[in-house]
A protein has these predicted regions:
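Short, flexible loop segments at the rims of nucleotide/cofactor-binding pockets, characterized by
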Residues: 30-33, 117-118, 230-231
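Ligand-binding pocket scaffold of soluble enzyme catalytic domains
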Residues: 20-66, 72-73, 79-88, 92-93, ...
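A short acidic (Asp/Glu
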Residues: 42, 66, 151, 221-222, ...
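Histidine-acidic metal/acid-base catalytic patches
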Residues: 3-27, 82-83, 101-104, 110, ...
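Structural motif corresponding to the early beta-alpha repeats
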Residues: 59-192, 196, 203-204
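A diffuse structural propensity rather than consistent per-protein peaks
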Residues: 38, 70, 183, 308-310
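Non-cysteine beta-strand/loop elements that form the S-adenosyl-L-methionine
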Residues: 51-57, 91-93, 141, 211, ...
Length: 367
């Protein structure tokens, strides 16, 4: 198969480009999903122990009639990241983000609108093909209608500011989204339509597609016309249902540990067993690590070391289940003295790196 311009596409496992060193045993690594637009940012990542960086190829020029990446654009992004001794194995699709559907430039897939969604799905096929040609082995995306819901920011330690979500404080006077009334069955039908058409292409080109669960789950009775954020229902049941749909080694999760905690009524007890079961599927392709204080419908995001989820235990479980991809810090708290959050993310990088090293020592029988 070819992409625009006639370039022949190879499967990612047999492609040109540097990518992962085939002689290095697979293992967990410290990653980041933070966007890097200059060498200084890449060097900041490298200094703090990051090995793998999620890439953001240029947004396709829709005004010129092209809605997908060219392989040359993905290659340029990959080469830029690799120039500082880092790896790019995952790219963020140019649409299907964690955006309120009303603000989305390309909402047709989530609205179930044909033929527009078929055009957008074809563009995703071409993005997957472009990644395969240059050795990018994964892409990540969301299936979001409501975007990331928050209700306030509250004070945290050292004068930091923390994201809060309380279902009771949502503004229930807001109208439905442009999607109108969407019950759970309809939401699943739209996800199924997407997976049915994209998973075979992911398999053909050996590029893994990784979906982030909706953040957070919807309150009882739904919100703004959406009955249920279906991947984020209590007990993690939506995640297992999602993985069973069009089951494939190339269809999986960009699993956010914080979002998983947010969908549970008793996260401090429930999360470890659910994570182990998900780990055994071998369908987690990336991890976002954040912590919370609270439970479903009422939580505050915290610093990674002070929440109710034991992140060292999380990383030990991932190691025990053979997880061998990146772990990225996520939603680090804000502070006025740290407008770019470089201080906060440095804390996150160090915390994760220490936990990974601890898990490796534990696995090697060292104390």
């Amino acid at each position: 198969m070819t992409v625009a311009g006639g370039a022949t596409v190879q499967a990612a496992g047999h492609s040109a480009g540097r990518g992962r060193n085939p002689n290095r045993p697979p293992k967990m690594v410290l990653g980041t999903q933070r966007r890097a637009s200059d060498v200084a940012t890449l060097q900041y990542f490298k200094r703090h122990g990051v090995e793998r960086v999620v890439g953001y190829p240029p947004s396709p020029p829709l005004s010129e009639g092209r809605g997908y990446w060219l392989a040359s654009e993905v290659a340029q992004t990959k080469e830029f990241i690799e120039s500082q001794g880092l790896e790019m194995e995952m790219a963020t699709l140019p649409f299907l983000g964690s955006t309120l559907v009303d603000r989305d430039d390309r909402p047709a897939i989530m609205l179930g609108q044909s033929p527009e969604r078929d055009r957008d799905i074809e563009d995703i096929h071409k993005c997957i093909q472009a990644c395969a040609e240059v050795g990018v082995t994964s892409v990540k995306y969301n299936m979001s209608l409501l975007g990331v819901l928050s209700t306030d920011r509250v004070p945290g330690r050292g004068g930091s500011s923390l994201r809060q979500f309380r279902a009771a404080d949502l503004d229930y006077s807001l109208p439905d989204t442009i999607a109108g009334k969407v019950d759970a069955d309809t939401y699943w039908e739209r996800i199924d339509y997407f997976l049915e058409r994209v998973v075979p292409v992911a398999e053909e080109y050996k590029v893994r597609i990784a979906c982030h669960p909706q953040d957070p789950g919807t309150p009882p009775g739904g919100y703004r016309g959406v009955e249920e954020n279906v991947l984020s229902v209590p007990g993690g049941k939506g995640l297992f249902k999602f993985l069973k749909m069009h089951s494939s080694a190339y269809h999986g999760l960009n699993l956010c540990v914080g979002t998983l905690a947010e969908m549970l009524w008793n996260p401090a007890d429930e999360i470890y067993d659910i994570l182990r079961r998900l780990g055994r599927t071998k369908r987690i392709f990336n991890i976002h690590l954040r912590n919370i204080i609270g439970r479903r419908d009422d939580f505050v995001e915290s610093w990674p070391d002070e929440g109710i989820v034991d992140h060292a235990r999380i990383i030990n479980i991932l190691a025990e289940e053979g997880y061998a991809d990146a772990i990225d810090p996520d939603h680090i708290p804000r502070h006025d003295d740290d407008p770019t959050r470089e201080q906060g993310y440095a804390h996150g990088y160090g915390f994760i790196l220490g936990a990974i090293n601890g898990a490796e020592h534990r696995g090697n029988g060292r104390s």
